[in-house]
From Swiss-Prot:
GO terms for molecular function: tryptophan synthase activity. This is Tryptophan synthase alpha chain. InterPro entries: Aldolase_TIM (IPR013785), RibuloseP-bd_barrel (IPR011060), Trp_synthase_alpha_AS (IPR018204), Trp_synthase_suA (IPR002028). SUPFAM superfamilies: Ribulose-phoshate binding barrel. It comes from Chlorobium chlorochromatii (strain CaD3). Gene3D superfamilies: Aldolase class I (3.20.20.70). The gene is trpA.
Length: 267
């Protein structure tokens, strides 16, 4: 079995800039050009959202993007098809950076757990993050994912106890994903700056109780915040701000241009 792209990336000593994108948002046909633009302008990992009709844990921007994606025909099967095309260079330059699928458990288990794992790895997916799947219930699923070569990522929040941080760190295959605040995605009230004492204390606590790398998401919008998070974590995830930049686009090409320009501004 070839080594997972995420595993290879985590062996490098670099700070990561990770993109979250909802497929086919805001227009059908945008996904492959956007992936190419993100890769070209320095995205280290690309997270693709799996749209769900009731995304209760997401902020309004991602909720709207999910509903738009559904209207544009996006299903889990469609997402896997797009990943396969991206890996093969069909409709864009070949995408070689790691791809993570992020979505709620209902669509994945409706697809069929083992079928999803097999089809995900076959299409070129490297990892999965299921926010509403408690780690305690994921042990068997985690073993099956590892057997096919998929990296599984779990969430840590500011209220997570030190003991639970260690438990989550032990389960996450390559890295954990830290929520920057106890809030829905993209609606953080905290600044996210390294100078924010609450954020610093939280991420120092995570560092003390983890052996693997961790990245931070939720509410990161610009280069200054990215660099602040790089001082405290191993990577920064930018999603809501990217979707906001794309929202007014009317063609796939315009989406790609906006994605590239915005992503370049974060580096």
């Amino acid at each position: 079995m070839a080594q997972n792209r995420i595993t290879r990336l985590m062996q490098q000593q670099k700070k990561l800039l990770i993109a979250y994108y909802m497929p086919e948002f805001p227009v059908a046909g945008a996904t492959l050009p956007v992936l190419e633009a993100l890769q070209e302008h320095g995205a280290d990992i690309i997270e693709l959202g799996i749209p769900y009709s009731d995304p209760i844990g997401d902020g309004p921007v991602i909720q709207n993007a999910a509903h738009t994606a559904i209207r544009n025909g996006v299903t889990l099967r469609k997402v896997l098809e797009l990943v396969r095309k991206a890996r093969n260079g069909e409709g864009c330059k070949k995408i070689t950076v790691p791809i993570v699928l992020m979505g709620y458990s209902n669509p994945l288990f409706a697809y069929g757990g083992d079928c999803f794992l097999a089809d995900a790895i076959d299409s070129g997916v490297d990892g999965v993050l299921i926010p509403d799947f408690p780690p305690e219930e994921a042990i068997d699923y985690l073993d099956r994912a590892k057997n096919v070569g998929l990296s599984v990522i779990f969430l840590i929040a500011p209220v997570t106890s030190p003991e639970r941080i260690e438990f989550i760190d032990s389960l996450s295959t390559d890295f954990s994903y830290c929520l920057a605040v106890n809030a829905t995605t993209g609606t953080a009230k905290l600044s996210g700056h390294a100078g924010d004492a609450a954020v610093e204390e939280y991420l120092h606590r995570v560092r003390q109780h983890t052996k693997k790398k961790f990245v931070v998401g939720f509410g990161i919008r610009d280069k200054e915040r990215v660099e602040s998070m790089w001082k405290l974590a191993d990577g920064a995830v930018v999603g809501t701000a990217l979707l906001e930049q794309l929202a007014a686009s009317t063609t796939p090409q315009e989406c790609a241009e906006r994605a590239g320009t915005f992503w370049q501004s974060l580096r």
